[in-house]
């Protein structure tokens, strides 16, 4: 589990409770509202709102003075320099709070990509499985069943070209890639685990069908990304306007 995965159990529990009463699209809308409110609240608390209000007044005055200037070029340079300086100061004031406020959003997106990304097939088997960076044999095994039979508790077992066991992982839509641990996994971990460092292959890529949260529009619009991101933007702008957050 990486740092961005820390709130994942809370997200999963909450989504599980909501799933009893709300369809996927409604849950995504609720997630978008909650995360928008949280991120804007963090931004408002961490940013110097009073100073930003004064600064925006100065910025408007500087732009107006530049627009209305009818003198020599030196005067234009002075007014332009002041306008740019105020804009850079504004960026310096909002950047730290904005970056911190983005962290909960990123954490939720990381979880949504795993929870609402791939979908289980009717057979329980993925659409395709590929090995990269070497040669290996893949076998789907369910305890109590014949090899290559899918079902509850199915495992994906990875063997070397010589038949040596390498690794295994639960076969579910959470397993989209089985690879060696990389430096970026301290941020976002692999829910399926990792290949051993000395494995003769680089990764196993497992392809599942895309989970569709609604039936509106073409297939590429039916995933979780479009409704969640669109609603998050709308909710964020609405909250900013209603509460007059600078």
Model-derived regions: residue spans:
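Juxtamembrane interface at the cytosolic side of transmembrane helices
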Residues: 44-57, 229-246
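Short, aromatic-rich amphipathic segments at membrane interfaces
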Residues: 9-21, 193-225
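Juxtamembrane "helix exit" motif at the C-terminal ends of alpha-helical transmembrane segments
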Residues: 12-15, 103-124, 239-243
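Beta-strand-enriched, solvent-exposed domains that form extended recognition/catalytic surfaces
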Residues: 122-206
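Hydrophobic alpha-helical transmembrane segments
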Residues: 16-44, 217-230
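Membrane-interface amphipathic helices and adjacent TM-edge segments
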Residues: 45-95
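Alpha-helical transmembrane signal-anchor/signal-peptide segments
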Residues: 48-62, 112-132
């Amino acid at each position: 589990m990486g740092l961005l995965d820390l709130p994942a159990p809370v997200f999963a529990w909450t989504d599980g409770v909501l799933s009893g009463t709300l369809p996927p699209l409604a849950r995504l809308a609720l997630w978008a509202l909650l995360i928008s409110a949280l991120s804007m609240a963090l931004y408002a608390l961490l940013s110097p709102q009073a100073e930003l209000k004064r600064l925006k007044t100065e910025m408007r005055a500087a732009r107006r003075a530049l627009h209305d200037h009818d003198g020599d070029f030196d005067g234009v340079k002075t007014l332009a320099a002041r306008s740019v300086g105020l804009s850079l100061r504004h960026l310096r004031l909002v950047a730290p709070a904005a970056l911190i406020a983005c962290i909960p959003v990123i954490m939720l997106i990381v979880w949504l990509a795993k929870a609402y990304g791939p979908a289980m097939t009717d057979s329980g088997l993925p659409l395709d499985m590929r090995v990269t960076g070497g040669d290996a044999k893949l076998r789907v095994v369910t305890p109590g069943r014949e090899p290559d039979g899918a079902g509850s508790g199915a495992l994906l077992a990875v063997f070397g070209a010589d038949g040596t066991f390498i690794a295994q992982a639960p076969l579910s839509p959470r397993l989209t890639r089985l690879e060696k641990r990389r430096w970026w996994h301290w941020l976002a971990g692999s829910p399926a685990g990792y290949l051993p460092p000395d494995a003769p292959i680089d990764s196993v890529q497992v392809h599942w069908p895309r989970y569709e949260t609604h039936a509106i529009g073409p297939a590429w619009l039916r995933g979780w990304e479009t409704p969640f991101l669109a609603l998050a933007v709308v909710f964020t702008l609405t909250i900013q306007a209603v509460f007059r957050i600078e």
